[in-house]
């Protein structure tokens, strides 16, 4: 009897912007997929309850998450971060989906994420080089 191939399970963290105003919040949920290829084309569309994110009324609250970018998750083994756009059930862009309004042929738009890090002094518990008793004070 041939050896059974071990199933590899991947965690896909779907991320989207909710419908809160004036400032949208990031939302996410995780889908576990067996033997995922690691390619964007193999990320399935997924739905969520838009009434809890101010993107739909209670009676007809399904919204769709359309994967548009895929990145390896630096924190989780076999993990991926799936950036998505919010779509209506008919596949049209949701009104909160400002990304869909960007003209793909216009190369003047640049977007990026910024992550800040601090190296802490283990003795003073302050950022390295910060004067003890100096300013600014704790926030």
Language-model features and meaning:
Residues 1-139:
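Glycine-rich, acidic/polar active-site loops that bind/position phosphate-bearing ligands
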